[in-house]
Amino acid sequence: MLLLGGKALRAGPLETAGRIAVGTGASMRSELMAARTERGAGRVSIERIPYPVDQAVEILKDVRHLILVGTVKPVAFFAYPDKPSLLTPPDCEVHTLAGPADDLPAALDWLAEELGVRTTAPELQVSQRPDLVSGALTTESIGSAVGH
C-alpha cells in the first residue's frame, strides 16, 4: 500500500501514485489529517485512513508492505484505552520512499520509472452530475438543479 501525505496529494504526484497503483496492483490511501487533497473529476481518487482505530486497523490488517510518501507511520492518538497504538499489523514492513520535507513529486516519478509504469493510465474520477428534475421545488430538486 502507498500511504500519501503532504504535497504528494496534489494533482501531479497523485496522478503518478495512481499510475503506480494501477501498474502494480497496490492500493493507496492518504494520511488522516491531510491539509490539502486535490480532488474532483479528472483526478485520481484517494481515501483517507479512517480516524476510528478499529476501522483503521481493519483497513490495514492485510498490508504487508507500507510505502510512505510525504507522511509518517500511521498511529492512533495517544493512550486510547484497549486499542493498539500502531495501526499496522506486526508483520507489516514500513518503507519510507520520501519524508514530508523531501521532493515528493520527484520521488514518485523515480518510483514510477523504476517500476516501468510511467505510461500506465491511472484511474481517474469521472464527472457525475445529477439528472435535471421537473415538478415542484423541493430541497432535493433544488440540490439537483444546483448540482447539474
What are these regions (language model features)?
Residues 93-114:
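Ser/Thr/Gly-rich flexible loops in soluble cytosolic domains mediating phosphotransfer, phosphorylation
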Residues 12-16, 55-58, 103-106, 110, ...:
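Generic recognition of stable, solvent-exposed alpha-helical segments in well-folded globular domains
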Residues 22-26, 65-68, 113-120, 147-148:
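Generic secondary-structure signature for well-ordered alpha-helical cores
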Residues 39, 88-91, 115-130:
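Gly-rich Lys/Arg/Thr-decorated short loops/hinges at beta-loop-alpha junctions or inter-strand turns
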Residues 6-97:
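Glycine-rich, anion-gripping cofactor-binding loops and their flanking helix/strand elements
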Residues 2, 48-56, 113-124:
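A polyampholytic, Gly/Pro-enriched intrinsically disordered region
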Residues 3-6, 95-99, 129-134:
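Flexible, glycine/proline-enriched loop segments at strand-loop-helix junctions
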Residues 123-148:
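Active-site diphosphate/adenylate-binding microenvironment
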